[in-house]
Amino acid sequence: MGRATYQLRSFYPTYPAHRFFNAPCQPPVLREWHNHFDNYGHFMPGYCGGISLGSWLELDELLEQGVDLDERPVLKFLIFEDMRGLFNFAEDFGYQEREQGYLSKCDLCTDLRTHLVSKQDFAELQPEEFYTHLA
């Protein structure tokens, strides 16, 4: 989604966060096809800019052993608890729901992650440049 949700917000209806709480994120995050490598060396899910599954330098190990979700709590919430879990996690870091609402689950996720990046360094929320150049 990236900047599109910020630039096109006035053209589409928005909804409260709870509308997207049960929208599944596991399939796009964990699928074995349509992934990307960014120019910073991150292995990324195909549709999820700003999320790193790990480094391309450790790709063989990553593909053999998988992602250590204990070291990547944001991914853990997205995989096992969808948006509701990530929203609750972000609230623990002071997140407040956006009054104007969200265009989609991806818009909500990006807003949650942007808030989390401002509060703490999360290995999976990379590259930092993704978040600093959103608006």
What does each model-found stretch correspond to?
Residues 2-125:
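Accessory C-terminal segments flanking Radical SAM cores
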Residues 122-135:
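Short microdomains enriched in Cys/His and/or Lys/Arg
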